Amino acid sequence: MGLPTLEFSDSYLDSPDFRERLQCHEIELERTNKFIKELLKDGSLLIGALRNLSMAVQKFSQSLQDFQFECIGDAETDDEISIAQSLKEFARLLIAVEEERRRLIQNANDVLIAPLEKFRKEQIGAAKADSQIGREHQNFYEASLEYVFKIQEVQEKKKFEFVEPLLSFLQGLFTFYHEGYELAQEFAPYKQQLQFNLQNTRNNFESTRQEVERLMQRMKSANQDYRPPSQWTMEGYLYVQEKRPLGFTWTKHYCTYDKGSKMFTMSVSDVKASGKMNGLVTGSPEMFKLKSCIRRKTDSIDKRFCFDIEVVERHGIITLQAFSEANRKLWLEAMDGKEPIYTLPAIISKKEEMYLNEAGFNFVRKCIQAVEMRGITILGLYRIGGVNSKVQKLMNTTFSPKSPPDMDIDIELWDNKTITSGLKNYLRCLAEPLMTYKLHKDFIIAVKSDDQNYRVEAVHALVHKLPEKNREMLDILIKHLLKVSLHSQQNLMTISNLGVIFGPTLMRAQEETVAAMMNIKFQNIVVEILIEHYEKIFHTAPDPNIPLPQPQSRSGSRRTRAICLSTGSRKPRGRYTPCLAEPDSDSYSSSPDSTPMGSIESLSSHSSEQNSTTKSTACQPREKSGGIPWITTPSSSNGQKSQGLWTTSPESSSREDATKTDVESDCQSVASITIPGNVSPPIDLVKKGPYGLSGLKRSSASSSLRSISAAEGNKSYSGSIQSLTSIGSKESPKAIPNPELPPKMCRRLRLDTASSNGYQRPGSVVAAKAQLFENAGSPKPVSSGRQAQAMYSCKAEHSHELSFPQGAIFSNVHPSVEPGWLKATYEGRTGLVPENYVVFL
């Protein structure tokens, strides 16, 4: 029930009813006054809490900003660099949100506190002061009229002067929340890419951990005196008997022995309570040439595990004491002592070795033939192992001395898992790995290079340095793995997954150490490069001018060229976002990012909930030298025929793999997903936003992006593409027509530098969202030496580009090594022009 009205005529009568109605208004104003006081108090507490929260978040952000990741090994993968930089990205994002919160707090006093306080004091207070009118007898009627007018005025002004400040404060609060929403939208692509990096790193960690754990268990179960091979035939601590005036003393020495030169070295290494270096006292090493070694008779000395040696430089014998009987046997064996030569414990002895002979080649070919004939689309091919007893039976049957070299494999007798496990077991048990110990370090150094192009060229050259049989076997195997990867839509065995499985098998380290285990991730990359660049590596001669890999120190500059969030001023959103960095800056070119292993469910939460409207682009597939041409594979769901499925060229790499001179174009990361009821056209995954996927320059044709399909029932996606594309919308996507002026589809990559993760922003906290556009023309091959006309004008952003007006005529137009760009001549000057800016005449 509302307040009764106050009539001016009633004020002259001053009736009891008028007094009662007037009192109702005064009581309401008093209640409003108390409420505003409480509201101001609570508002001050809210602002104080926001200020404390802001300070806490800023301190948290600073902690994230200051922390520095360090990784094991002398080089880092792009995944590790991205993950190491992620904390700084989180810090920048939080700082951007806190900047908006700071503005909210600064304006809160002017928007909320001051207006309400002013209204309470000036309006309600004035009405309360007028309540003294009862005591005034002079000019009673005139004052009464003014009082009634004031009461009415305050009651009406309360409706807007009281609520308006609250609305302004809430508007500011919602502006802050909207800013957080925009930042979350902007952060989503980076978050997805970081999830890819994390999943990829986790898979690498799992494979590395298994190898390290296996090595640790072998060391635990083996005799503690087992020592991996090194530059010395034998080394370790021994006690040396030294004569003293009153008897003998035993001094601990660190001794080494080289069997080839027969040089024996002793370095004093004894612990003194008052010595320096934490009690460790070391002396200069003494070197001797060994003459003979003999075991000391047990009853001739009161010490155990002793043996005597004679050296050229000293007269008499030197008595040494080992730590155990097994350790003494190893020393005697190394020095050709008069003890029998004992072998290493059986548990660490090598498995039965295989060889690259006729039987081995036949076995590999038969296994591959069986897999390709009946099981190349089986889910988890090569990842899921067979039963050990069956695998061992297959190996014993095939490689038995009585078996002929060309023995057939009965595919009815052996299941697919047993055959694939047998193939891996054969390669794993070779006396020397297929890539050889000699070239192992060279391959590792090659893929540690920051230069993506050099990686491929160096691996190409090193493969041709392999022995003929090794290269022939590698050719057979990699050709098969390429076929397997082309069916990753069904078997989920992407190039990245195959690299994880066959990397340690083909590039087994000679020394089983933790340091060698840390290089497993680079072994995987070598295999990925071999698969993706199969045609070039095995069917073309390497460039003789490519220098062989040289050992290099860990680069400290790679991490500085990482993802960055600018804190510049806000700019309005445009339809298309232009270049995100200066042409000469490191951030202008994007380095390869890695893509994760194939997983059906991982990172798929964004696939079906984003973008009810899809903007798309069609890029021109091109067949490049050393690569596999783009193919279109029909796929269907429940009998419903779907659109052709674009698959990316294996020439682009999946993790840190280098591209050739023809660096993969952004537009080659096009993929199409078919869902019953709605079909989306190919989508350009390149988002030129602050967290856009421009960092996928090379990983655009990642093995994980090789193929995508969506089943009607569960909408499961092969590979890990699902969280990258976000296409599976619940509503039917609609294509947006071509804009008048398309942006340059493919930013040129500078081949002389390799920046890290290329997520740039054009100077704003909430940058312009990535734009996708549709190319109505069908893909046409680019011919050499033709004329072309410019459809749009263009201003050069780099010294190697051409500036030209609309309608300009180009001559001698032919493809360039830059993806998405053509080389042309205009007005006597030759340079690069965007491929989608011109039409051939």
Swiss-Prot record:
Q: What is this protein called?
A: Rho GTPase-activating protein 42
Q: What does this protein do?
A: May influence blood pressure by functioning as a GTPase-activating protein for RHOA in vascular smooth muscle.
User: Where in the sequence is Phosphoserine found?
Assistant: 649, 707, 720, 723, 778
Q: What are the site positions for Arginine finger?
A: 383
What GO cellular component term, any one, is given?
A: cytoplasm
All copies of domain BAR, residue ranges: 7-228
Under the heading SUPFAM superfamilies, the entry gives:
BAR/IMD domain-like, GTPase activation domain, GAP, PH domain-like, SH3-domain
Q: In which tissues is it expressed?
A: Highly and selectively expressed in smooth muscle cells.
- For region Disordered, the annotated ranges are 541-667
Give me the stretches of Basic and acidic residues compositional bias: 653-663
Matching Gene3D superfamilies: Arfaptin homology (AH) domain/BAR domain, Pleckstrin-homology domain (PH domain)/Phosphotyrosine-binding domain (PTB), Rho GTPase activation protein, SH3 Domains
**PH domain spans which residues?**
231-340
